[in-house]
Amino acid sequence: MIGIDKVQEFLGEFKTNYVIIGGTALNLNLSDSDLVERATKDIDMIMLCESMTPEYLSKFWDMIRDGGYKPSTISSENGEKLTFYRFIEPTDPSFPSYIELFTRKPEGIILPEDIHLVHIENTDDLSSFSAILLDDDYYNYAKEHATESHGIQIIDKFALITLKARAYVSNLQLKEAGHDIRQHNIDKHKNDVYRVAF
């Protein structure tokens, strides 16, 4: 998997600050069981807000800079807008092709129900990030099932099975409700459950 060594290099000493989910976690679990990995190029990372430190955020930003990433853009009414929760197109090909950030709503903050992003400030640096909000159950489940593999923090295979099954059902329901969900994005989660479970 391209870029795992870079994540370990930059974030290896900060394992309590994050947990990696998705295809990268799947591949590392498969690798630990001597099974064939699925092609993946990205890192989906939950930032653990209870234990997040300025040192971790600074190291994370070093990884983004050294990889030559740029923030992705989304279309808005006023034109394209930079997003600081998804970093893409690294100039150094030894880094993951993109990194996407997730977290949960910080304690004591009241947000409108339709908000799906939260701002993460690094007080010791001018840099800051955003992250896609997860519901508390998903966030806590991933955190409780964090394990170390290849020098980084990922979710274990039991959590992968549960979360992949949930993603399969969710995408299937969205497609049945008329949303534009590609069949590939439904089938891959089902196939991943079979692969990691056996």
Please give the residue ranges for each predicted region:
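Compositionally biased terminal segments of proteins
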Residues: 1-198
